[in-house]
Amino acid sequence: MTTRTTQSGIIETLAGNGEPGYAGDGGPAGAASLNEPKGLCVDREGNLYIADSENHVVRRVDRVTGIITTVAGVCPSGATGPAVPEPPVAAQAEEDEDPFADHSGDSTKAYTQVTDLSGTVRYVTGGRLTVEHDSGDGGPARRARLNFPSAVAVDRAGNLYIADTMNHRVRKVDAATGIITNVAGTGQARYYGDDGPAVSAAINEPTGLAVSDEALYIADQSNNRVRRVDLATGVITTVAGDGTAAYSGDQVSAVQASLAGPSGVALGGDGVVYVADTFNSRIRSVDPATGQIATVAGDGGTYRYQGPAEPSSPSLSRPAGIAVGSDGNVYMTDSDSHLIRVWNGRSKTISRLSGTGVAQFGGDGGDALAGSLSYPFGVAVDASGTVYVADTFNHRIRVLTATA
């Protein structure tokens, strides 16, 4: 695999003013506040959905008007937003405990995020708002409670799927009614339930989603697997990963291969399932005909982009978000290198689209290659090839548009 740079495009901010918080609903998206946005998706009309993770909501930017609104979740207490009656919220005192212990038996723990120098995000308990894990199912999505949502996907009918990450569930907002329901996960941070109803199966920190007419795919990150929910039957199965956090198994059955914290999943037009195998620093693919897995990008090497003067490298550094364009190219957030890159399936080359390798904000209105990002997590691409980026630690959504 070789590397190159792409034809220059323009980078701009679409949503977020850079100040972490929750504000601006009903106004221009660029003037609104976001708080560590993670996943993104674009519907058939070009409207953008944002998993506004630290705000525990999903927001929508209207393609025509540029107005931002909240479509799922309850805004944080004290935040500036639309007046929506909320159920009582419980507070929890901070405790001394192992921040990485298994709390799956306690569904009312409060979580916050800590990040190490590499940008790895962890969830720890104590001291924040308690989020009721099952609050809102069967009612309006705007009154439901989410817990660090990390990914969103929209199907052909306009139904919205949400990776409700720290509730260990995937939820669905009906396009016609706005009602939210659970479609996968019991709320327990465990692994069980394959070949049975997805709502009776356990998933563990889902962080990526992709949906087709037939199935919903879930990056079941802490189970080191990719799961599939048949939309006709509701049955869940594993399509990749043996549960071991390791790298192994290319050119074998995907369910016999090892993944390490997969954070993203995407579908090609030919049915190929692409996986951001984050802690293996690779992009993997699963062939729909054979079920075999292969590595398509990344070599597992330790890599941090140092600038255009350095020798080109095919290595990735904890890729998180992934999307497939109508041209079959695979777009990815090379998160720890603060880059957006693209893999060309025809030429087998990997290219830099945006990012300088430095975690900062800059470059709006100019060459996308000179634009700075900070730990980008999510990426989406629309039918015209416009690329949307969750510039997570800059608390913005950036957009990359091609030049003539």
What is each PLM-predicted segment?
Residues 3-36, 66-91, 103-148, 178-205, ...:
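Gly/Pro-rich loop segments of beta-rich domains
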Residues 42-45, 154-157, 211-214, 267-270, ...:
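Residue-level detector of Asp-centered blade-edge/turn motifs that repeat once per structural unit
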Residues 47-49, 159-161, 216-218, 272-274, ...:
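Conserved beta-propeller blade signature
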Residues 53, 165-166, 221-222, 278, ...:
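Short loop/turn segments immediately following the C-termini of beta-strands
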Residues 56-60, 67, 168-172, 179, ...:
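A short loop-to-beta-strand structural motif that recurs across blades of beta-propeller domains
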Residues 321, 333-337:
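Loop/turn-rich, solvent-exposed surfaces of beta-rich toroidal or solenoidal domains
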Residues 375-404:
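Blade-level signature of beta-propeller repeat domains, shared across WD40, Kelch, NHL, RCC1
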